[in-house]
């Protein structure tokens, strides 16, 4: 007896969206269901090699499609892994890997763009409801006895019950809406398969009725004959020699592989022979995948052994900083029954990974030769590329060459260009870390370097706080934070004479008394336009904020205060009353902290003194 179940809230939202909103490119429903069938065949192909109870299974993978114009139905069937009752509940009734939540959060309101997101978010099955008022799924899991039927009209609930099905696999029948009945046509289905699923690695067969006429005049008779033909080529495109492939072949395969409606930016097709034999086909997308910065991101690379699918969920096939790459690795040397544990320690795969990484970085270097193309690439993938600096020491120098930065003088500069622009007086490549570029550009400390004609890299990506201190140097030139003592020493600031130092001692003492344990020292300076500058050895407010967000204890670094005695404010403060000096110290220190992106510890005191100053000025 069938039992009723409620969809999760997000699934109900998604179904409503599919039925009422995402009607642009409705034809993708077939692409998605064929893709799911292909995945089911991939999984069973692998299990027949690795799972004892399935090794004797007779299995010739295929996808069958049939239709009935009168009944307005389309049926898609595969003989893959199949589903049992629990699988149906998990895959068809609730959210898997937060895919649906992510999908819903990414919707833009543009129907064409939103339709294009369907496959990328793993919610493709529900696209059936774009054209069907009723969907019936009958499935039998390989190695199990019972078969189950899943039925829904897309209205918030579904039913599951036992059914009769002889062989393993899944059959999905769509009962089409009146306005979508035209999809139940041989030519419609063939056209969609050629457009979206030509390069699916398994044969797709279409059953149809062909009419023939015999006789003449009144004796003319229509003879209907049931026929079946294979629609796709079912070839592993990556195994076809490059000379035999056209750009359109690569682009069509990319669409099948990635479910991305945009064309790829570049592709790299490599066949390696010798001690190791393998083929790789990698794509660099135009747009970043939605989960690029998620911990549970989906790997974009599929691993095959001798054309047998092994996994699409191994994040070690490429370094994490190349997780935007889509593609295929097909090895001739790995054992077919390779396990996930073996994969992680396998020398063959490690060699393939190393060579593939170099190939991809080389192609990115080629993109960088065209500034317009590289700006497009870097806007999408620049942040994630920086991660390679702390994880891929072998390719660190190549990655450094690929990075681009905003600086005080330029909006888009490489380290090579920065170095070439350095004057003879400049000893280091200088950078400054902060939460946003506007704050960095207004930082008082930056003025000191600008006055000397030194350019400064302005770094506001969170990843910068982690990787830049680790870089050390570029082409034998050290990289230094402008907050460091070494960088400040390179400014060559004129020393303060003894008479001036003595004249300002009361003011220095007043600042020390007012700020107490919040500072390490007060010094005099004569460079820059700002009245006060904070100096912290290895100051990194971004890193401090990151550590605080992660619940880690932030090591306290007390700043050195530099008072700019060329600023008219200090000429007046030098003879001011003690209460005025205290008030000025608190306000100037607080303002400097805000400018550098640090947190005010004594915000209440700052606010009190600010209000007091405003009252005095009125």
From Swiss-Prot:
Main location (coarse class): cytoplasm
User: What are the boundaries of the region A?
Assistant: 1-340
Q: Which Pfam families match?
A: HATPase_c_3 (PF13589), HSP90 (PF00183)
Q: Which family does it belong to?
A: Belongs to the heat shock protein 90 family.
Job description of the protein: Molecular chaperone. Has ATPase activity.
One Gene Ontology cellular component term attached to this UniProt record is: cytoplasm
- The organism of origin for this protein: Helicobacter hepaticus (strain ATCC 51449 / 3B1)
From which lineage does this chain's organism come? Bacteria, Pseudomonadati, Campylobacterota, Epsilonproteobacteria, Campylobacterales
Does this UniProt record's set of keywords contain Cytoplasm?
A: yes
- Keyword set includes Cell division: no
Q: Enumerate the residue ranges of region (B).
A: 341-545
Q: Which PROSITE patterns match?
A: HSP90 (PS00298)
Q: List locations, semicolon-separated.
A: Cytoplasm
Q: Which InterPro entries match?
A: HATPase_C_sf, Heat_shock_protein_90_CS, HSP90_C, Hsp90_fam, Hsp90_N, Ribosomal_Su5_D2-typ_SF
Question: What is this protein's name?
Answer: Chaperone protein HtpG
Task: Cite a single GO MF annotation.
Answer: ATP hydrolysis activity
């Amino acid at each position: 007896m069938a039992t009723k179940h409620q969809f999760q809230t997000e699934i109900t939202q998604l179904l409503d969206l599919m039925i009422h909103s995402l009607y642009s490119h409705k034809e993708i429903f077939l692409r998605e269901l064929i893709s799911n069938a292909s995945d089911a065949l991939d999984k069973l192909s692998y299990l027949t090699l690795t799972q004892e109870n399935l090794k004797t299974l007779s299995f010739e993978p295929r996808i069958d499609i049939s239709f009935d114009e009168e009944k307005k139905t389309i049926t898609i069937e595969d003989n893959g892994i199949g589903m049992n009752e629990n699988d149906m509940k998990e895959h068809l009734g609730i959210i898997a890997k937060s895919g649906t939540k992510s999908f819903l959060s990414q919707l833009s309101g543009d129907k064409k763009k939103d339709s294009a997101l369907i496959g990328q978010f793993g919610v493709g099955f529900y696209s059936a409801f774009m054209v069907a008022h009723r969907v019936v799924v009958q499935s039998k899991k390989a190695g199990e006895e019972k078969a189950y039927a899943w039925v829904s009209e897309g209205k918030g609930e579904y039913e599951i019950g036992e059914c009769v099905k002889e062989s393993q696999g899944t059959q999905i029948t769509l009962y089409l809406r009146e306005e979508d009945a035209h999809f139940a046509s041989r030519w419609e289905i063939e056209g969609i398969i050629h457009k979206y699923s030509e390069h699916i690695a398994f044969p797709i067969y279409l059953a149809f009725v062909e009419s023939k006429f015999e006789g003449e005049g009144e004796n003319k008779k229509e003879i209907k004959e049931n026929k079946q033909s294979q629609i796709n080529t079912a070839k592993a495109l990556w195994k076809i020699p490059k000379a035999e492939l056209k750009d359109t072949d690569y682009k069509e395969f990319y669409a099948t592989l990635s479910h991305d409606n945009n064309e790829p930016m570049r592709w790299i097709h490599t066949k390696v022979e010798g001690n190791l034999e393998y083929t790789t086909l990698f794509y660099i997308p135009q747009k970043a995948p939605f989960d690029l910065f998620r911990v549970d991101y989906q790997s974009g690379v599929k691993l095959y052994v001798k054309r047998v699918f092994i996994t699409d969920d191994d994040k070690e096939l490429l370094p994490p900083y190349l997780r935007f790459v889509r593609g295929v690795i097909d090895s001739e040397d790995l054992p077919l029954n390779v396990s996930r544990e073996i994969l992680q320690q396998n020398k063959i795969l490690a060699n393939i990974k190393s060579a593939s990484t170099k190939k991809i970085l080389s192609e990115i270097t080629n993109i960088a030769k065209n500034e317009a193309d590289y700006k497009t690439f870097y806007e999408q993938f620049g942040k994630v590329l920086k991660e390679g600096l702390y994880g891929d020491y072998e390719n660190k120098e190549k990655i450094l060459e690929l990075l681009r930065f905003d600086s005080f003088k330029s909006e888009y500069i490489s380290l090579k260009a920065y170095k070439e622009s350095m004057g003879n007086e400049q000893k280091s490549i200088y950078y400054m870390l902060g939460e946003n570029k506007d704050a960095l550009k207004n930082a008082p400390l930056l003025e000191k370097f600008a006055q000397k004609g030194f350019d400064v890299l302005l770094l506001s990506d969170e990843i910068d706080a982690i990787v830049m201190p680790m870089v050390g140097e570029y082409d034998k030139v050290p990289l230094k934070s402008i907050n460091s003592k070494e960088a400040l020493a390179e400014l060559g600031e004129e020393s303060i004479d003894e008479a001036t130092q003595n004249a300002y001692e009361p003011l220095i003492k007043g600042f020390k008394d007012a700020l107490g344990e919040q500072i390490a020292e007060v010094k005099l300076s004569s460079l820059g336009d700002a009245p006060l500058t904070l100096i912290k050895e290895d100051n990194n407010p971004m890193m401090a904020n990151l550590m605080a967000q992660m619940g880690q204890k932030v090591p306290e670094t007390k700043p050195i205060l530099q008072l700019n005695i060329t600023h008219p404010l200090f000429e007046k403060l030098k003879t001011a009353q003690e209460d005025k000096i205290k008030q000025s110290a608190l306000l100037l220190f607080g303002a400097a902290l805000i400018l550098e992106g640090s947190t005010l510890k004594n915000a209440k005191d700052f606010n009190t003194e600010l209000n007091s100053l405003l009252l005095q000025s009125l």
